[in-house]
């Protein structure tokens, strides 16, 4: 009888691992978690986590820079995902409460999303799914055409007030991969405010406008003399979230930007 029981145990399916309770404080991490097939592990997300649509049904924990610590703690998470750059105080407060925090490094190149995918997958016990997603995204990056001999000079206006990007942000690299050259690529900074005078002096040949309308941009002082305006390359058609989040949708949006810059070639 004992031998029979042992044989039965050998052939019974293994009990599934207990699902983790995860909180994501970054929209890009939320997208990655869903892409890994781990959306059901999420018990809390930031108020900015709006993709995929299923994220809207998950408990909100506030701004990713200033999350509601009590709310996060009340969700009894096994792990909380946040950016190491987003605020040491958040990590410190949660850690002091005994909450495990995965503070992930900032993506400074577009392909850094592959590292983020692997780190999140490992923390969730989904290494195989992480390897598969990482391989798919890597293939998408590798399939991108080489840069043209003379890349267009591109100004990225990420937000009102002249907020733009220097070489320390993955957005600058995204522009390069799309075949452009960031006019502020020489700035060893991430995000900063450029003056309108600086933009005019650099005379970009294309503008990526992630906030506001082309009409408003073209109405600015002396904008009509800018090469981008003359060429009709004030681009507003990008999906802001897909382009500004280092997640699974980024390679597709980079390819879309290339088409908007150069047409279907």
List the predicted regions and their residue ranges.
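Sec/Tat signal peptide C-region and signal peptidase I cleavage site
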Residues: 14-19
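Short helices/loops that flank or line small-molecule/ion binding pockets
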Residues: 69-76, 97, 193-203
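A ligand-binding cleft/hinge motif common to bilobed small-molecule-binding domains
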Residues: 86-96, 206-225
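His/Asp/Glu-enriched short active-site or ligand-binding loop at hydrolase and phosphoryl-transfer sites
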Residues: 46, 168-191, 233-236
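A short, structured surface patch at a secondary-structure boundary
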Residues: 20-85, 183
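Solvent-exposed loop/turn segments at secondary-structure junctions
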Residues: 28-32, 48-51, 80-81, 86-88, ...
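Sec-dependent N-terminal signal peptides
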Residues: 4-13
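Extracytoplasmic substrate-binding proteins
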Residues: 21, 89-163, 184-186, 202, ...
């Amino acid at each position: 009888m004992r031998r029979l029981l042992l044989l039965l145990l050998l052939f019974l399916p293994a009990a599934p691992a207990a699902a983790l309770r995860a909180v994501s404080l970054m929209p890009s991490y939320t997208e990655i978690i869903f892409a890994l097939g781990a959306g059901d592990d999420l018990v809390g997300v930031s108020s900015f986590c709006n993709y995929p649509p299923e994220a809207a049904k998950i408990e909100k924990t506030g701004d990713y820079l200033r999350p509601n610590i009590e709310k996060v703690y009340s969700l009894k998470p096994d792990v909380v995902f946040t950016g190491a750059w987003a605020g040491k105080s958040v990590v410190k407060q949660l850690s002091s409460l005994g909450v495990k925090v995965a503070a992930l490094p900032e993506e400074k190149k577009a392909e850094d999303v592959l590292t983020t995918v692997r780190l999140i997958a490992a923390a969730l016990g989904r290494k195989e799914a992480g390897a598969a997603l990482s391989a798919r995204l890597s293939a998408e990056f590798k399939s991108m055409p080489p840069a043209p001999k003379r890349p267009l000079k591109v100004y990225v206006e990420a937000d009102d007030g002249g907020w733009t990007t220097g070489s320390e942000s993955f957005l600058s690299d995204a522009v390069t991969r799309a075949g452009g050259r960031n006019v502020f690529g020489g700035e060893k900074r991430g995000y900063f405010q450029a003056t309108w005078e600086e933009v005019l002096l650099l005379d970009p040949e294309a503008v990526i406008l992630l906030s506001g309308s082309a009409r408003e941009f073209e109405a600015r002082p002396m904008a009509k003399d800018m090469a981008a305006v003359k060429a009709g390359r004030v681009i507003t058609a990008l999906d802001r979230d897909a382009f500004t989040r280092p997640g699974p949708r980024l390679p597709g949006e980079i390819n879309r930007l290339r088409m908007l810059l150069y047409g279907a070639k």
